[in-house]
């Protein structure tokens, strides 16, 4: 039995996959972890350097391989895995797809809770705090470079 979990980022796919796999028992696989192992870097780094198209190509290949590798797994897909029709088709044909649907309010609350937990930790270790509200990439880079120039060398 293959079970494939889909849903928005933050809806709990990875956590639920591990819990379901323990109960059945099946193997739990996190597609994003498989992708990062294959790439040798974070998804964000790869995405930034190579673009969304290249990332989606890798994601498509991983989904194809993982969904045929074992007849007994629970797969947590990445939040954007369903963007390609071939991924939706393969998931539907190769197992039972479960959509973990979380409301925008639930997702926002989870993100807010995570923010509340981590913001003090980020601040504790930061030399500078740069507010990203309303700023595009070039503006953020400019702000960072200005801050570094004003501050001079920062001790390691």
Go through the PLM ranges and name each one:
Residues 19, 23, 117-156:
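NTP-dependent small-molecule kinase module
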Residues 30-92, 121:
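ATP-dependent small-molecule kinase phosphotransfer cores
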Residues 93-120:
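A glycine- and Lys/Arg-enriched "phosphate-lid" helix/loop adjacent to the NTP-binding pocket
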Residues 8:
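P-loop (Walker A) phosphate-binding loop of NTP-binding proteins
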Residues 5:
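Hydrophobic anchor at the beta1->P-loop junction of P-loop NTPases
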Residues 13:
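Conserved lysine of the Walker
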Residues 79-81, 103-105, 135:
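Short glycine-rich anion-binding loops that position phosphate/pyrophosphate groups of nucleotides
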């Amino acid at each position: 039995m293959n079970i494939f979990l889909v849903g928005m980022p933050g809806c709990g796919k990875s956590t639920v996959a591990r819990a379901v796999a323990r109960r059945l028992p099946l193997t739990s696989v996190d597609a994003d972890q498989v992708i990062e192992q294959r790439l040798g870097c974070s998804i964000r780094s790869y995405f930034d350097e190579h673009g969304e198209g290249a990332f989606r190509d890798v994601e498509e290949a991983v989904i194809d391989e993982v969904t045929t590798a074992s007849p007994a797994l629970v797969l947590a897909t990445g939040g954007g895995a369903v963007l390609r029709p071939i991924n939706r088709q393969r998931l539907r044909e190769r197992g039972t797809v479960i959509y973990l649907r979380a409301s925008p309010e639930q997702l926002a609350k989870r993100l807010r809770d995570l923010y509340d937990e981590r913001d003090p930790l980020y601040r504790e270790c930061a030399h500078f705090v740069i507010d990203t509200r309303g700023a595009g990439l070039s503006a953020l880079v400019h702000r960072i470079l200005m801050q570094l120039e004003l501050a001079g060398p920062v001790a390691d």
